[in-house]
Amino acid sequence: MAKLDFDALNSTIRYLMFSVFAVAPGELGEDRADVIDEAATFLKQQEDKGVVVRGLYDVAGLRADADFMIWTHADNVEALQSTYSDFRRTTALGRISDPVWSSVALHRPAEFNKSHIPAFLAGEEPGNYICVYPFVRSYEWYLLPDEERRRMLSEHGMAARGYKDVRANTVPAFALGDYEWILAFEAPELHRIVDLMRDLRATDARRHTREETPFFTGPRISVENLIAKLP
């Protein structure tokens, strides 16, 4: 990979949207070829609007209330809102998909380590598996001395040093919804995310996490396979 221009990347405005849906059994019927073609065409067309579809993810069974998640990103939130609304209004899949959860985040430079760039923004390929969740820091966190927070974040980073295959996308979400941060881990194997998350529990920064649910986890999947598997 080419050397990253951290200044350029950190000056980039990039919004992310994670949208989770559920489908009622039987709504799609048995013949789904037209639904697949329409959905695939719709997602491809979003490129013309400046919207990147990073992936579709199968979350069925890992949650009882959801079937799939879409991750999109663009340089303005209106484009993401348009894709979200158009998907629900103009596609057969969208019309029978009930919203479960949707959150938006915006890339901003990391507070202490300007080289900490989200994987998607650094040009990395999407991972085979994803784990997305929001989190909210303790009330005390932002009032702690900079050096104390720097120390805890450094320790947190050191705990993850054995998981270089797990790529992080940690993105601020202040004022964009109910959370302060949205985090998406991508990895080639799901168990690597599980092991990393467990190890990160044993760090001081964990004491300053006030909220970190819901979790949406699953494999990246093609449009064809997703629609074929839906109930």
UniProtKB/Swiss-Prot annotation:
Covalent cross-link Isoglutamyl lysine isopeptide (Lys-Gln) (interchain with Q-Cter in protein Pup), where: K44
Single GO MF descriptor: oxidoreductase activity, acting on the CH-CH group of donors, oxygen as acceptor
Enzyme Commission code: 1.3.98.5
Cofactor binding notes: Fe-coproporphyrin III acts both as a substrate and a redox cofactor.
Annotated S-S bridges: none
One Pfam family it belongs to: Chlor_dismutase
Residues reported in the UniProt entry to bind Fe-coproporphyrin III: H156
Cofactor or coenzyme needed: Fe-coproporphyrin III
Coiled-coil boundaries: none
Enzyme class: oxidoreductase
Function: Involved in coproporphyrin-dependent heme b biosynthesis. Catalyzes the decarboxylation of Fe-coproporphyrin III (coproheme) to heme b (protoheme IX), the last step of the pathway. The reaction occurs in a stepwise manner with a three-propionate intermediate.
Full protein name: Coproheme decarboxylase
Gene source species: Mycolicibacterium smegmatis (strain ATCC 700084 / mc(2)155) (Mycobacterium smegmatis)
This protein's encoding gene: chdC
